[in-house]
Amino acid sequence: MPAVAPSAAESRHSNTFLRLKKKLERGVGEAIADYNMIGDGDTVMVCVSGGKDSYTLLSCLLALRERAPVDFRIVAMNLDQKQPGFPDDVLPAYFESIGVEYRIVTEDTYSIVKDKIPEGKTTCSLCSRLRRGIIYRTAKEIGATRIALGHHRDDMLETLFLNMFFGGKIKAMPPKLVSDDGQHVVIRPLAYCTENDIERFARGMDFPIIPCNLCGSQENAQRKQIKTMLQGWARDYPGRIESLATSLRNVVPSHLSDSALFDFVGLTRDTRVGEGDTVFDPPELPAAAAPITLRRADDDGDRSAT
């Protein structure tokens, strides 16, 4: 007889899954500690879209709160954008089943986006702006001192390369930021967690995933190209993605070219800069470092640049 796949409940009790759960919670805990994301008395509004990332974020924060050295409140928040076919009963039922305080906000941003954006064009930018305004307003209404978003390590790296390749900037997603009006602190506790681990965890937990019909099938072509590139590197060159992620926390402004970050104009022979002379030294690389190969996302041939 063919083997029967274990149920979600059975897999949640396997040693493999428990190790994965511990790994994710440890990553979230380290990010919170490293960036002082949550303190005693904070109210954390966790934005839950119904996707794997936000479900995982909520699960990890609830688990960590049980043993955290500080006391903080968690409020799950979902924005119902009135997308056709959106199952508005799924998230309330889930929140109640796990006993978390929650707020469902209903705003028909779907109609606004469809009215303003021509058919076939990417809706992400306008949708994001509308959603951000509603999230900030809701955070103020419930007294949230922190707004937690479900972006993970791979999102941050994709954004870094998007800005470098298409925007001419070295800019990614910060793990913690203050809104432009200074009223809200936004945190990304999954900053150290990988998408692969999150996907495995979400499958094991059997979260009631809700697809986004507005944008889920029209993934930005540029982001898709970057994602494909990073996935290829992860597959072909083990350790490269981890090194890239580490580089986001090891920036040396004096070895870049931005005068807003380092005073090159005022630099003289009397100026002492850490790592100054190392510019002449070869970088310390593993003995068998693999060459970096870039291919066009639509290129199935051998054309490459190393």
UniProtKB/Swiss-Prot annotation:
Protein name: tRNA-cytidine(32) 2-sulfurtransferase
Lineage, top ranks: Bacteria, Pseudomonadati, Pseudomonadota, Betaproteobacteria, Rhodocyclales
SUPFAM superfamilies (alphabetical): Adenine nucleotide alpha hydrolases-like
Subunit structure of this chain's protein: Homodimer.
GO cellular component: cytoplasm
Reactions mediated catalytically: cytidine(32) in tRNA + S-sulfanyl-L-cysteinyl-[cysteine desulfurase] + AH2 + ATP = 2-thiocytidine(32) in tRNA + L-cysteinyl-[cysteine desulfurase] + A + AMP + diphosphate + H(+)
Molecular function terms from GO: 4 iron, 4 sulfur cluster binding; ATP binding; magnesium ion binding; sulfurtransferase activity; tRNA binding
EC number of this enzyme: 2.8.1.-
Free-text remark on how the cofactor is bound: Binds 1 [4Fe-4S] cluster per subunit. The cluster is chelated by three Cys residues, the fourth Fe has a free coordination site that may bind a sulfur atom transferred from the persulfide of IscS.
Motif stretch (PP-loop motif): 49-54
Disulfide bond sites: none
Pathway: tRNA modification
Names of required cofactors: Mg(2+); [4Fe-4S] cluster
Role this protein plays: Catalyzes the ATP-dependent 2-thiolation of cytidine in position 32 of tRNA, to form 2-thiocytidine (s(2)C32). The sulfur atoms are provided by the cysteine/cysteine desulfurase (IscS) system.
InterPro entries reported in the protein's UniProt record: Rossmann-like_a/b/a_fold, TilS/TtcA_N, tRNA_Cyd_32_2_STrfase
CDD domains: TtcA-like
Other comment: The thiolation reaction likely consists of two steps: a first activation step by ATP to form an adenylated intermediate of the target base of tRNA, and a second nucleophilic substitution step of the sulfur (S) atom supplied by the hydrosulfide attached to the Fe-S cluster.
Example GO biological process: tRNA thio-modification
Family, similarity comment: Belongs to the TtcA family.
Annotated [4Fe-4S] cluster binding sites: 124, 127, 215
Name of the gene this protein is made from: ttcA
Subcellular location: Cytoplasm
Keywords in alphabetical order: 4Fe-4S, ATP-binding, Cytoplasm, Iron, Iron-sulfur, Magnesium, Metal-binding, Nucleotide-binding, RNA-binding, Transferase, tRNA processing, tRNA-binding
Classification via Pfam families: ATP_bind_3
Top-level taxon of the source organism: Bacteria
